[in-house]
Regions:
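Divalent metal-cofactor coordination and adjacent catalytic microenvironments
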Residues: 1-168
Length: 168
């Protein structure tokens, strides 16, 4: 499964190569998960991370070309220091966040619904369940969200409220 990290490519499926992710993780304290993974799993996690980032984030600016497969590179974007970002690069914070997210995806399926998440309380007598509107799992780890601050709007999982449970 070859990875295609061609900038603005029509069939690109990752923002970074395995080599770029390896370089990022070489400076990371918790590197064992990444270094223990096979190249195939690294590629899969990078592709999945890229896809999920594009699904969960409305990036600042506009796609540079209509033909590019991914949402980056983008036009009309400034970095956190207000410098214009070139339309022929993937900014380093996006690359680093992709690598970080890919490592998290190797550890667990962050797209799965965690059991019990969102439940505020459960009463056994006459059965009562109260759901929390704020206790919902997010696909993007907090560190990845922090790394991407200022690069777009992050959309979390749909929030939910309470439902009526009827005992039969």
């Amino acid at each position: 499964m070859a990875i295609d990290a061609t900038i603005a490519g029509t069939s690109s499926d990752s923002y970074i190569t395995v080599a770029t992710a390896d370089a990022y993780h070489a400076t990371h304290l918790y590197v064992t998960t990444w270094t223990a993974a096979t190249t195939d799993n690294k590629e899969r996690s990078l592709k999945m991370a890229t896809r999920l980032l594009d699904e969960r984030i409305t990036w600042t600016g506009t796609k540079n070309t209509d033909a590019q497969a991914l949402r980056w590179p983008r036009a009309s974007v400034t970095d956190n220091d207000l410098y214009s970002v070139s339309v022929d690069i993937i900014p380093e914070p996006i690359q680093n966040a992709t690598a970080e997210f890919a490592r998290h995806l190797l550890v667990s399926d962050l797209t799965a619904q965690p059991e019990g998440k969102g439940i505020e309380s459960v009463d056994a007598g006459s059965v009562s369940i109260k759901f929390s509107k704020t206790d919902t799992a997010d696909v993007l780890p907090a560190i990845v969200q922090e790394m991407l601050r200022g690069w777009g709007t992050i959309h979390s999982r749909a929030k939910f409220g309470s439902v009526t449970v009827v005992r039969t």
